[in-house]
Amino acid sequence: MKILVKIRLTRVGTHKKPFFRIVVMDAKAKANGAYIENLGHYDPVLGKVVLKKEAILAQLQNGAQPSETVKNILSQEGIWKEFIALKDANKKRKAALAKAK
């Protein structure tokens, strides 16, 4: 059975000082529950984003679904576009292998 995982934000900031971790967690887990892997953090006050690019791409290729907010952050950082390019390249490679057989 395949576990559905999501890439989403968990709030760890204090009152009126939001700060979020970008984490991979089970889709059915609570928003601030236990997570599988920490992929970076986001500070909306300063507009600062720190991401682990390779880990994010690996999780996306394994089928993790980003939340809308995380998808927007990944798009702004150029990671989502890179993931789509990798996905298309893999499709073309598989099609070429299937055609060769």
From Swiss-Prot:
Q: Its GO biological process terms?
A: translation
State if Oxidoreductase is listed as a keyword.
no
InterPro entries linked to this entry: Ribosomal_bS16 (IPR000307), Ribosomal_bS16_dom_sf (IPR023803)
Q: Report the GO molecular function annotations.
A: structural constituent of ribosome
User: Which SUPFAM superfamilies does this chain map to?
Assistant: Ribosomal protein S16
- Work out whether the entry's keyword set contains Ribosomal protein: yes
Q: Which family does it belong to?
A: Belongs to the bacterial ribosomal protein bS16 family.
PANTHER family in UniProt: 30S RIBOSOMAL PROTEIN S16 (PTHR12919), SMALL RIBOSOMAL SUBUNIT PROTEIN BS16M (PTHR12919:SF20)
- Protein name, UniProt field: Small ribosomal subunit protein bS16
Protein's organism: Ureaplasma urealyticum serovar 10 (strain ATCC 33699 / Western)
